[in-house]
Regions:
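Structural beta->alpha junctions
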Residues: 41-53, 83-89, 159-164, 189, ...
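Extracytoplasmic
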Residues: 30-34, 49, 54-57, 67, ...
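Hydrophobic, regular-secondary-structure patches
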Residues: 13-92, 99, 117, 134-135, ...
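Alpha-helical membrane-protein architecture signal
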Residues: 55, 236-239, 243-246, 282, ...
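Peri-transmembrane interface segments
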Residues: 213, 225-258
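Transmembrane alpha-helical interface segments in multi-pass membrane proteins
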Residues: 1, 8-12, 255-320
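Mid-to-C-terminal secondary-structure elements
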Residues: 98-114, 123-226
Length: 320
């Protein structure tokens, strides 16, 4: 029981701490000092799903009118089947600007970013993630190749460095990034912007920046003082702290459950020692007869119990 209990406690606590660290790393991969602004209310059934989407001009207004900001990236998304080299792959197609790479801590593995002319003109060019490259191009060079998103043929101008799994279990590398004008004009046929990604300066007051963004967007969306916000501003740092706190609580709960095995093991040792005392009555009587003190006999059995527990704990540590 002690072996199993000790091993279970160590394993559960280690797994919990590992999960906490993984969550922190994945949240940090979303971007440093990052705010995500999305349409819809933060709380409540439906979450404001009918709220008006943003416009690209909203991102420009935030970037120019609010201090403490490094970059603002408008983001539009669409799922689509991507075709290249006779292979098909369903992926997430993202429309944005070069600021999207900065806000998300993305690095270029090969190739280049979008040029200003390509962004203005909505050129048929794209950057792809590692998963899309692997599924569509295999071992061949993807940079300079053509791929088709729906009916639009795009030239691959860059390959993004791999980031792996995201904080919510999604594959961050399974994506195609193109200029937002290209996505809106040629893929979705509308000017909706799903998310505004705001990267703040180091040391910026996230609370103040959030309040300034909220006030600016309320004015731009013409909300009355009595109207609730039809958008929400999420601080990824706070999200990371919340998720880390949740995983820590789960770690403690798992450790407590595993500790029950230790309790059961302790009860088992107690029962064994009781049986041992019964079977060794003659030995105890002989020791008392030749002058041993009662506390010395008790100490002997206590040492035996501690030795059994320690041995079981050591074996449990080794097994864990």
């Amino acid at each position: 029981g002690i072996v199993i209990g000790g091993s279970a406690v160590i394993t559960m606590v280690t797994l919990g701490n590992g999960a906490t660290l993984a969550v922190q790393n994945q949240i940090s991969s979303l971007g440093t000092n990052l705010l995500q602004v999305r349409p819809g209310q933060r709380m409540g059934p439906g979450g404001g799903g009918g709220a008006a989407a943003f416009k690209e001009s909203d991102a420009e207004a935030i970037a120019t009118q609010i201090g403490g900001i490094v970059a603002v990236a408008p983001e539009a998304r669409s799922g689509a089947t991507v075709v290249a080299n006779g292979r098909n792959w369903t992926s997430s197609v993202i429309g944005s600007t070069n600021a999207w790479l900065l806000t998300g801590n993305w690095k270029l593995g090969q190739g280049r970013e979008f040029s200003d002319d390509e962004l203005r003109a909505g050129a048929a060019v794209c950057l792809i993630g590692e998963t899309v490259r692997r599924e569509l191009f295999g071992t061949t060079d993807a940079v300079g190749a053509q791929l088709r998103v729906k009916q639009v043929s795009c030239t691959v101008i860059g390959l993004l460095a791999s980031k792996g799994q995201g904080a919510f279990g999604n594959d961050q590398d399974d994506m195609v990034l193109m200029p937002i004008q290209t996505l809106q004009r040629r893929i979705t046929g509308n000017t909706r912007v799903n998310t505004l990604l705001v990267s703040m300066n180091d040391g910026a007051d996230a609370t103040r920046v959030t309040a300034d963004i909220t006030q600016l967007l309320r004015e731009r969306r013409k909300l009355a003082e009595t109207d609730e916000d039809n958008f929400n501003v999420l601080d990824t740092k706070q999200l990371g702290e919340t998720l880390s706190g949740t995983t820590r609580i789960m770690t403690m709960l798992l450790g407590a459950v595993a500790a029950v095995s230790l309790l059961v093991g302790g009860i088992g040792i107690m029962n064994i020692m009781l049986v041992s005392v019964t079977e060794r009555t003659r030995e105890i009587g002989l020791r008392l007869a030749i002058g041993a003190l009662e506390r010395e006999v008790l100490l002997q059995f206590l040492i035996e119990a501690v030795a059994l527990s320690a041995l079981g704990g050591l074996v449990g540590i080794v097994l864990a």
